[in-house]
Amino acid sequence: MGLRGINLKEEYRSDRNNIVSEFFLPCLSNCIEYDRCVDFLSIQTLSTFSIAFDGFAERKTKLRLITGHRFRTADLNLLTKIFSEKYTKSFKGKLIKDAKIQKLQDIVNNGQVELKIAIPNSEQISDTFSERIGIFRDEEDQTVAFTGTSKESFSDQTRDFESVDVFTSWNDKSRVERKVKDFEELWENKTKHVKVYDFMYAEENNLLKYSSEWILNN
């Protein structure tokens, strides 16, 4: 069907819409690329992508994620194993018994998931990276961009009250192009006030903050 075939609204809000079933899942099922900036990332959140994408592996869908540098200890340890070549090779693709996480490891091994870390490097930014944008692309090069939600959960039971503003390449081309440019500049580490690193580089160089005491509900 493609993204243009979805009956998209300009805004989705928790009191009026089921944001997961009306927006996220239709877009995920009809895209071949998904770019996303989120405040923080958990292994539970990332593993849901292997389920949320309809035919993720078959369609070779690409996922690029940029997140902040704070993690739970358990999440960071498991993400390191999933993204580290030395771990995945030693376990020969059978690192995790959990089915969802095993699927995640498979698509990471296939090169379908890339993860980068954004860390503020300016006195003007006091805390952490918290930009919230997302971009879907389909096979016809149509694009849907959105802003507003901080979570990447596809459970209707665990979401916050939130709203999502939506822009499409066929109705709001200039704004979509601006969001695409913003993401690409972040991805290429060309954005002022933040430095962006590959996940494994950040982990190996002790740039990530983690603690079992942090409460990061996702």
Region spans (language model):
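PLD/PLD-like phosphodiesterase catalytic module centered on the HKD motif
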Residues: 1-218
